[in-house]
Amino acid sequence: MAISYQLKSPAFRGLGRRKSSVARVILLKGSGKFTINKREAKEYLKSDIYIKDALQPFDLTQTNNTFDIRVTVRGGGLAGQAGAIRLGIARALLEISADYRSVLKEAKMLTRNTKVKERKKPGLRKARKARQFSKR
């Protein structure tokens, strides 16, 4: 699905959130260089699974290696941060071309995953786990 587009500005921004992570993504015309918090993505995310997850919007829109990605991400763990980066990239791609919306929406890349860890309640071991109850 090769969509032709005219770049309106040099940088395209997107904000993504997942669990307690917030990612600010900037896409620049380039060769596919991926940096997270001024470090190389492989060095930061460590696992190829997280990197593949974060770059999924590029696979769907067939725009691999056409943009340099600069990300500032805070909070949460690596899985949450990868999910936040994925949403940020998808939103930044929409700024480039609105034609990507149908492809990204169909793959649920534009939907914020609102699931957040439930808090621990007093008197319980975890959020819902209680001690074993004996009736007699």
Swiss-Prot record:
NCBIfam families xref list: PRK00132.1
Keywords: Ribonucleoprotein, Ribosomal protein
One term under GO cellular component: cytosolic small ribosomal subunit
Family to which the UniProt record says this protein belongs: Belongs to the universal ribosomal protein uS9 family.
Recorded name of the encoding gene: rpsI
UniProt-listed InterPro entries: Ribosomal_Su5_D2-typ_SF, Ribosomal_uS9, Ribosomal_uS9_bac/plastid, Ribosomal_uS9_CS, Ribsml_uS5_D2-typ_fold_subgr
Taxonomy, superkingdom: Bacteria
MF terms (GO), sorted A to Z: RNA binding; structural constituent of ribosome
Start-end of Basic residues biased regions: 117-136
GO biological process, one term: translation
Chain spans, region Disordered: 115-136
UniProt keyword Ribosomal protein, yes or no: yes
Protein's name according to its UniProt entry: Small ribosomal subunit protein uS9
